[in-house]
Amino acid sequence: MTDAVGSIDTPDAQDEVPESKKTRKGGKRAKKGPLKRLATFYRQIIAELRKVVWPTRNQLTSYTTVVIFFVAIMIRLVTVIDYGLNHAAKYVFG
């Protein structure tokens, strides 16, 4: 019978953590100061915004047109349903 991957007899190399990477007693890492954490947060925001694929002007125009057209259709649909339900309520309740 073969041993399963990561069994106790043969530990994986990735399970070993170098001494410099180990956490302190209790499993918590040292806290950074509030300004350091804020700077890291903003750095991460900038890094994520650089990954965004922004639309071209033509794409933006076409997407905006589609959204406005769809919203206009939905407004008309809700208006027709409201008008119909209003007349149905007047018919039922007098």
From Swiss-Prot:
What molecular function terms (GO) are annotated for this protein?
protein transmembrane transporter activity
Record region (Disordered):
1-32
**Record's InterPro entries?**
SecE_bac, SecE_sf, Translocase_SecE/Sec61-g
Presence of the UniProt keyword Cell membrane in the record: yes
Stated family: Belongs to the SecE/SEC61-gamma family.
Q: Which HAMAP family match?
A: SecE (MF_00422)
Name under which the protein is recorded? Protein translocase subunit SecE
Species of the source: Streptomyces galbus
